[in-house]
Amino acid sequence: MDLSNLKAAEGSVHSDNFRRGRGHGSGNGKTAGKGHKGQKARSGAPRPGFEGGQMPLYRRLPKRGFKNRNTLTIVPINLSALERFDNDAVVSVETLIEAGIVKNPRDGVKILGNGELTKKLTVQANAFSASAKEKIEALGGKAEVI
């Protein structure tokens, strides 16, 4: 060890910010680098969204609508998507979730008549279009509203 590779002991060197406001000799006494008076010299910060007394944006804009948390989201499913089920199968919301057609178990299901159906199925859904119901029943299946 010599004078060219001296190092301070670990933990002994601190940032100057730890010693603010500790007398004139420090160069950061009295106002501790905050300047004189005024909003920025005070403790605490204004709350988010405060615009210095000007009418804030969230009060200048009109209130408009809301999102109803109890609304049932209806997922439309075409008859062509039901082709993957076996003949005489019962197609319910649970089986549609297992097949990956419906993602959220809280969603409702409406069966639409787009595409062709070639299998006899018992389909349980929240709603059916007229053409879908007609096509399901034409093959001897059932369209049950749950």
Swiss-Prot record:
> GO CC annotations?
cytosolic large ribosomal subunit
Instruction: Using the UniProt annotation, give all residue ranges assigned to the region (Disordered).
Output: 1-57
Q: Please provide the Gene Ontology terms (biological process) for this protein.
A: translation
Among Gene3D superfamilies, the record links this protein to: 3.100.10.10
* Subunit architecture: Part of the 50S ribosomal subunit.
User: Which family does this protein fall into?
Assistant: Belongs to the universal ribosomal protein uL15 family.
Q: What is this protein called?
A: Large ribosomal subunit protein uL15
